[in-house]
Amino acid sequence: MAGNFWQSSHSQQWILDKQDLLRERQHDLLSLNEDEYQKVFIFFANVIQVLGEQLKLRQQVIATATVYFKRFYARNSLKNIDPLLLAPTCILLASKVEEFGVISNSRLISICQSAIKTKFSYAYTQEFPYRTNHILECEFYLLENLDCCLIVYQPYRPLLQLVQDMGQEDQLLTLSWRIVNDSLRTDVCLLYPPYQIAIACLQIACVILQKDSTKQWFAELNVDLDKVQEIVRAIVNLYEMWKDWKEKDEIQMLLSKIPKPKPPPQR
């Protein structure tokens, strides 16, 4: 996306402090521990990814939808809106902002119903419960909570520039790109600028592919390497968690622990 990141609402309003983020989560962390909380967000990032792929959206749109989802819950408890409703709402909004084209509401609902039945039946025993009016109402609430700050800068563009500057081949770009996609399952998109995330993902890819010759190139970068290493640790921790996590066995239990909205008082 063209424009100056440093003058954007992404830079000025949506690079959050880690302590503030943890403080906002305290209510949810009464019901879920930190690992469980992260697993819930990994699951819903996967839901957004599957819905996006079935709608044939570009990865940029899927990534923006995932960032909207994480931004909303950075300021709100999970009990405020059912994540299963917010996920398709974020996709609908991201497709508009990223100028992908209009997704028909009926098609979105149909894809949600199909995905829950075929891809996520291990998590949900009932059908997708929401209709168009729920998603449109949720979209207003989402816009309000994002302060209408809808332009999201992603790490993909700086990653392309870095790989070109490094003079490396497609294999490195392909792996780095996948790691950027994986990074959306962590908090790094809320805490760090996209160019730092791109550098961290590129560094992980170089280690995996044993590109020892790139060490000098990284050393000469004008970047806060401590921040880059924090991002690397967050992504490596994600991979460590993934190794041992049996999602299909655990997710129903985790979803049942999510705090639910209180029903309105009976009149």
Curated annotation (Swiss-Prot):
Family in the record: Belongs to the cyclin family. Cyclin C subfamily.
Highest taxon in the source lineage: Eukaryota
General function of this protein: Component of the Mediator complex, a coactivator involved in regulated gene transcription of nearly all RNA polymerase II-dependent genes. Mediator functions as a bridge to convey information from gene-specific regulatory proteins to the basal RNA polymerase II transcription machinery. Mediator is recruited to promoters by direct interactions with regulatory proteins and serves as a scaffold for the assembly of a functional preinitiation complex with RNA polymerase II and the general transcription factors.
Primary localization: nucleus
Assembly mode: Component of the Cdk8 module of the Mediator complex.
Cyclin N-terminal domain mapped to chain residues: 48-151
Compartments reported by the entry: Nucleus
Pfam family, one: Cyclin_N
InterPro entries per UniProt: Cyclin-like_dom, Cyclin-like_sf, Cyclin/Ssn8, Cyclin_C_2, Cyclin_N
Tagged with keyword Zinc: no
GO biological process annotation, one example: regulation of transcription by RNA polymerase II
Name of the protein described by the UniProt record: Cyclin-C
Organism per entry: Drosophila pseudoobscura pseudoobscura (Fruit fly)
PANTHER family xrefs: CYCLIN
Gene transcribed to yield this protein: CycC
GO cellular component: mediator complex
Molecular function terms, GO-annotated: cyclin-dependent protein serine/threonine kinase regulator activity; transcription coregulator activity
UniProt keywords, alphabetically: Activator, Cyclin, Nucleus, Repressor, Transcription, Transcription regulation
